[in-house]
């Protein structure tokens, strides 16, 4: 009976460790996805800001040519 308890306790302990390692691995994979989404979002914001600045510059040059006041 004592040997059976020891082996069951050992199996429970090993199963708990295995489950813990799986959860850590899963959370590490999830963090990678979040970082990737943040990078994509950051790239899109940068591209939007560059396009906005180019448009403003072009409009200023066009206004300058039309009015002739530069």
UniProtKB/Swiss-Prot annotation:
Residues 1-22 form the signal peptide. Belongs to the frog skin active peptide (FSAP) family. Brevinin subfamily. Pfam families: Antimicrobial_2, FSAP_sig_propep. One of its GO terms (biological process) is defense response to Gram-negative bacterium. Residues 23-39 form a propeptide. Expressed by the skin glands. InterPro entries: Antimicrobial_frog_2, Frog_antimicrobial_propeptide. It comes from Odorrana ishikawae (Ishikawa's frog). One of its GO terms (cellular component) is extracellular region. This is Palustrin-2ISa. Disulfide bonds join 64-70. Has antimicrobial activity against Gram-negative bacterium E.coli ATCC 8739 (MIC=100 ug), against Gram positive bacteria S.aureus ATCC 6538 (MIC=25 ug), methicillin-resistant S.aureus ATCC 43300 (MIC=100 ug), B.subtilis ATCC 6633 (MIC=12.5 ug) and against fungus C.albicans ATCC 90028 (MIC=100 ug). The keyword Signal applies. Keywords: Amphibian defense peptide, Antibiotic, Antimicrobial, Cleavage on pair of basic residues, Disulfide bond, Fungicide, Secreted, Signal. The keyword Secreted applies. Its main location: secreted. It is found in: Secreted.
